[in-house]
Amino acid sequence: MFQKKFRYMAAVLAALMITQGSFTAFADEIGPGYDEQNKASTDTSVTDPANAWKKVNGVYVDNNGKTIEGALLRGISVAKWQGDIDWAKVAADDISFAFIKMMSYGYEGGYTMDPNYEKNMKGAMDNGVQAAPYVYLQTKTVEEAKAAAKYAVEKVSGYNVKYPIAVDVESKYILELSVQELTDVVNAFCDTIVAAGYTPIVYSDYSKFTTEMDTKQIHYDIWLARYGADGTYEGRTIWQCTDKGHVNGINGNVCLEFAYKDYAPVTKGTAVDTGEWKNESGKWYFYRDGGRMSLHI
């Protein structure tokens, strides 16, 4: 009898461990470039019209053929789900910028780098596509958000990043916070990015921007995910219009973006070979090329 009970308990424990492991992995996969319902955004059974989200007669048009007022540049967002990307073909298909997944950063300092991050950063930049890293944030405290941002700054060292470093706010874990708590976490991440001399941007969908955080307290640019023909939102400088786009050089569907602001001429981020954070008398400073750059807020 004891042996039977032991075997039963062991089987239950093993099942729980497998379930927990699968759940953790799934939580790490969501983000731009990932279709939660269809897993990776590679299902080509549903696509937009052939001329949707492209430049027609000198202007960008939506999936109904209407002009996208104010759209300056077309871009994409990618992660490991897009596999090997031919960046030369991407660049030739009127793609000016790309949000590239850097990592998922969780609570208690845990993080997972996207395996294609460095390859995609180099591929984009080598072909004239502005690369913009994004971090899928799962932190629950201000201090953890600051740590995530500092690590992100270290991981862009060596790249000539001119577009924003994005914080992806959609994890179910981070959404357990109150509106004020989540707003504070987002601001902490962005403040730290600014302190290092880079430009931050906040990614989420319309529902979360309007119900989960107080955007009136977030004085940073908005990267809005709202699929269809309405990308208007206060503070929105980049609009993710669809996850069913198609771009040469990428197998399957990909998220398409439109920029209403060209960051390249104004962003302060530059290639950094020796950038690092140092704690001096309880305060954090970022050093570039041997000199102190700015105070960590």
Indicate residue ranges for each PLM-predicted region.
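Sec-dependent N-terminal signal peptides of Gram-positive bacterial secreted proteins and lipoproteins
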Residues: F2-F26
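Functionally critical loop-and-helix segments that line ligand-binding/catalytic clefts
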Residues: D28-G83, A88, T215-V272
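Substrate-binding cleft of extracellular glycoside hydrolase catalytic domains
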Residues: G58-C190, V194-A196
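Hydrophobic anchor at the start of a short beta-strand
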Residues: A131, T199-I201, I222
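Short beta-strand/turn micro-motifs composed of small residues
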Residues: V135, S204, R226
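Glycine-rich, charge-decorated loop segments at or immediately adjacent to ligand/cofactor-binding or catalytic sites
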Residues: E144, K208-K216
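Aromatic-lined carbohydrate-recognition surfaces of secreted/lumenal glycan-active proteins
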Residues: I193, G197-T210
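Extracellular adhesion/carbohydrate-binding repeat motifs centered on closely spaced tryptophans
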Residues: T267-I297
